Amino acid sequence: MNWVLVFIAGLLEVVWASSLKHADSLLDWIIIFILIAVSFILLIRSYQKIPMAAAYTVFVGIGTVGTYLTGIVLGESFSAAQMFFLALLLAGILGMKLFTKESKSQPGGEK
């Protein structure tokens, strides 16, 4: 369940980061602020069972890969070298997810 929170937080990061370029009204900025807040709340909640470094790395990686791919869909240029390094980043994200165990401890450090 906690990895689901990280995944949703990462997807929200893609949405708000991609929206920054197109925001041109107060309502747009309010929505972006809400998306930022919700994404970080979900990320922080995931820290209850997932090591902070792993959760944050996966969160940022999802945001990076997703935002980059969104840029490509919206017509931004890309190269074979960029795609290679994006694939390496994706492999690192998957590795962090696969080799990180969730903690059994409760919030506050009690076991």
UniProtKB/Swiss-Prot annotation:
One of its GO terms (biological process) is transmembrane transport. Keywords: Cell membrane, Membrane, Transmembrane, Transmembrane helix, Transport. Belongs to the drug/metabolite transporter (DMT) superfamily. Small multidrug resistance (SMR) (TC 2.A.7.1) family. It holds the Pfam family Multi_Drug_Res. It comes from the Bacteria. It comes from Bacillus subtilis (strain 168). GO terms for cellular component: plasma membrane. Its main location: membrane. It is a multi-pass membrane protein. This is Uncharacterized membrane protein YvdS. SUPFAM superfamilies: Multidrug resistance efflux transporter EmrE. One of its GO terms (molecular function) is transmembrane transporter activity. Disulfide bonds: none annotated. The chain crosses the membrane at residues 3-23, 24-44, 54-74, 80-100. InterPro entries: Small_drug/metabolite_transptr, Small_multidrug_res. It is found in: Cell membrane.
